[in-house]
Amino acid sequence: MATTSVSSPKSKPSWVSFLSGGLAGVTAKSAVAPLERVKILYQIKSELYSLNSVYGSMLKIVENEGIKGLWRGNSATILRVFPYAAVQFLSYETIKNHLVADKSSSFQIFLAGSAAGGIAVCATYPLDLLRARLAIEIHKKPTKPHHLLKSTFTKDGVKGIYRGIQPTLIGILPYGGISFSTFEFLKRIAPLNEIDENGQISGTYKLIAGGIAGGVAQTVAYPFDVVRRRVQTHGFGDAKAVVNLEHGTLRTIAHILKEEGILALYKGLSINYVKVIPTASIAFYTYEYLSNFFNKL
């Protein structure tokens, strides 16, 4: 295994990290948008989930809404993901380059990734709320994103457009930290046959490393994602699962465990693996490819 043969990249200009991150996020999320919509629909309902029903759910969406229905809410996703991923990767690179003393320390990289995820969530959360609510409208004409955001703000104010941010932040801290630190660790131990004469790791290895990083991080953070979606969509559209908005994140998790069992906290996880692994692979690979490309301009 190689631990010192990988070339150490120079610090990227801020605009490179920002633009590369945004484009990487949009590319990855758009590719798996149909799976994301089906996952959200399962998370917010109390019925049992089966991976075998994914295909049937997609067919039902196509039957009711047409093929475009599989991408309903993706416009809001793109509006959110570009700034989210841009801010996340920019924050990560900035923190790593200026505050992380030991670039080979997985713990310090974990902290940088966690902080970057938290910053990105706070900056773009209303758009994430918007995406979730658009995704669960399955029996009526789609609401215009800006109309939905305006009506939510008018009805509930700032608190309304940030509903569910607590479990989101609690979940993104381990997710961001684990995904970045795992990806960087896997790059450091890349086999010699995956490294070229210039010290560059192969694209195939980066795709695999990104997928592993996303899968590991998602397993740890997923229960918070379920809570987030339930809080975000409570009383809206086809959301049926019971949730008490007065409860904090941990009390909500305890309530779900009591009423529905531990499997409810992992509802949709199997489809999420199918979604997250290619998403993380594409995002990390595209980011590194584009940042290297832009650095040469």
UniProtKB/Swiss-Prot annotation:
GO molecular function: coenzyme A transmembrane transporter activity
Location(s) in or outside the cell: Mitochondrion inner membrane
Keywords recorded for this protein, A-Z: Membrane, Mitochondrion, Mitochondrion inner membrane, Repeat, Transmembrane, Transmembrane helix, Transport
Segments annotated as Solcar repeats: 12-98, 104-189, 201-293
Main localization of the protein described in the UniProt heading: mitochondrion
Protein name (record): Mitochondrial substrate carrier family protein P
Membrane topology of the entry: Multi-pass membrane protein
Role, per record: Mitochondrial solute carriers shuttle metabolites, nucleotides, and cofactors through the mitochondrial inner membrane. Required for the accumulation of coenzyme A in the mitochondrial matrix.
SUPFAM superfamilies associated with the record: Mitochondrial carrier
Any one of the GO BP annotations: mitochondrial coenzyme A transmembrane transport
Alphabetized InterPro entries for the sequence: GDC-like (IPR002167), Mit_carrier (IPR002067), Mitochondrial_sb/sol_carrier (IPR018108), Mt_carrier_dom_sf (IPR023395)
Any one GO CC term of the record: mitochondrial inner membrane
Species for this entry: Dictyostelium discoideum (Social amoeba)
Matches recorded under PANTHER family: SOLUTE CARRIER FAMILY 25 (PTHR24089)
Record-stated family: Belongs to the mitochondrial carrier (TC 2.A.29) family.
Gene responsible for this protein: mcfP
TM region positions: 15-35, 66-86, 107-127, 165-185, 207-227, 262-282
Domain of life per record: Eukaryota
